[in-house]
């Protein structure tokens, strides 16, 4: 289900990437390249995770990816806010960028979840990851 949702989000994101990558506005181009790079970095890291024989390593790298994702969200929101205040992008661009940043975060989050499901077989390690997730929510 996460894979199907990621594909759906990717289709929505792809429309605006195509539109804004060819824009004359360098600021919006940079932001969409930033989104593309974040997704690409995640996919590359997941490929590295896939080749790991150590399931604890898979879990720890997955958690590091999640921390990276949180940092991206904070940075992206701050950057978009600055671009709006400095009138570097218009309201329509800002709305698209906020929505697409959200979709990119969903895609990355789901890819991380799928990677853990696919490459962690040991139930104890899976539970350890779930316990860690639950403890962060308190």
Language model features with spans:
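Cytosolic, long alpha-helical scaffolding segments
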Residues: 1-138
């Amino acid at each position: 289900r996460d894979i199907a949702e990621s594909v759906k989000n990717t289709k929505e994101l792809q429309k605006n990437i195509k539109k804004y990558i060819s824009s004359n506005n360098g600021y919006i181009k940079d932001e969409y390249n930033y989104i593309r790079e974040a997704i690409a970095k995640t996919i590359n890291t997941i490929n590295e995770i896939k080749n790991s024989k150590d399931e604890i390593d898979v879990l720890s790298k997955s958690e590091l990816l999640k921390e990276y994702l949180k940092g991206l969200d904070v940075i992206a929101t701050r950057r978009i806010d600055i671009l709006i205040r400095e009138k570097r992008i218009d309201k329509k661009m800002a709305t698209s960028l906020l929505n697409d940043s959200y979709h990119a975060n969903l895609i990355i989050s789901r890819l991380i979840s799928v990677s853990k499901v696919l490459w962690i077989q040991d139930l104890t390690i899976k539970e350890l990851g779930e316990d860690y997730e639950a403890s962060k929510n308190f």
